[in-house]
């Protein structure tokens, strides 16, 4: 039975009453409806609930701890104090493509602000609107897993979905540019390599990601490099082996290097990332928890477990079915993993693009290994457990960025909480 047939059967089983129950449940308790939807995550009605909960969750974003997660505060202030007309946006687009000195680094954020403030001055509307493109591409990517005939209602499949989404989860919409770019890049990359012949459509999708976040000017040549190396699988696996030590290299070692020996444009970029202020903000997380060494050990464990993934996957490279359906993506994954390992010492940049690797890791584990071998799924969950705990339970991003009544109040109450607000 083909994947499409399986999907059709699943959708046909959904009747009017199932839709009515889930939507009514959502009105009464959005988070409860979200949890219930996970029971049948592949269904159309469940995807509708995922989408609606994502929008209402982002509408409800509001800083609860002003000393942490200043991305949300900064974006809110930008939304509140920025005012763009249609003419302003058009001029920014022209300046951007003319490479003018005063052109914005990217266009996406200002466009979102313009659209949002065309309807209301409420900054919460900005996050609700920003959630829409994020959710479209995240859920389209997720559907590439749930539409597979192997996907079932087991705990292993739910763990795979979690590992797939967690690197760039819904809370990251607090700064929507990079996280939206990630899911566009992930979706377009997977679909590009799924095609029998390489697709211009999906390449263009990757090519427009720098308009969303300027950091994707790094990903675009990286992607093209992967295409150039597609006929050299042995080279890519050797690059991965060579890159492994770099994945453990710390800022403390590399910050002592003399970057002035590099070409001017590279030295300026490196010194910017390596200066003490940048390190304190993004690496030490000053003002946060003092369990520094616990976090470092947990990071080493997580890095090690993820490094096992390509080694497990590589064993299946000569399997005829794997080679036919996933061979091109597997080789690209090995290549991009190696390339990003080489820049792990760079604060922010290395971590940002490692999120794409982690998402692809979960996808390929499901497509290539599951269900014949399930232990790697558990290892990954254990390797990520400390960071899941810190993010969702120990004063992390969720409790600092979203009032916790989003998890127990009904939908009308959550909407009214920030109705008519013009500040934070």
Residue ranges and their predicted role:
Residues 69-88, 218-351, 396-424:
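Alpha-helical transmembrane segments and terminal signal-anchor/GPI-anchor hydrophobic tails
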Residues 200-224, 341:
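Membrane-interface alpha helices of multi-pass inner-membrane proteins
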Residues 129-148:
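Transmembrane-helix motifs of polytopic, lipid-linked glycan transferases
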Residues 44-92:
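Extracytoplasmic loop-helix module adjacent to an early transmembrane segment
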Residues 142-164:
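Transmembrane-helix signature of polytopic, membrane-embedded enzymes
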Residues 159, 167-185, 212, 310-372:
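Membrane-water interface signatures at transmembrane helix termini and the short loops
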Residues 185-200:
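Membrane-interface transmembrane helices that cradle and orient dolichyl/undecaprenyl
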Residues 73-78, 89-121:
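Short hydrophobic/aromatic helix or loop-helix immediately within or flanking a transmembrane segment
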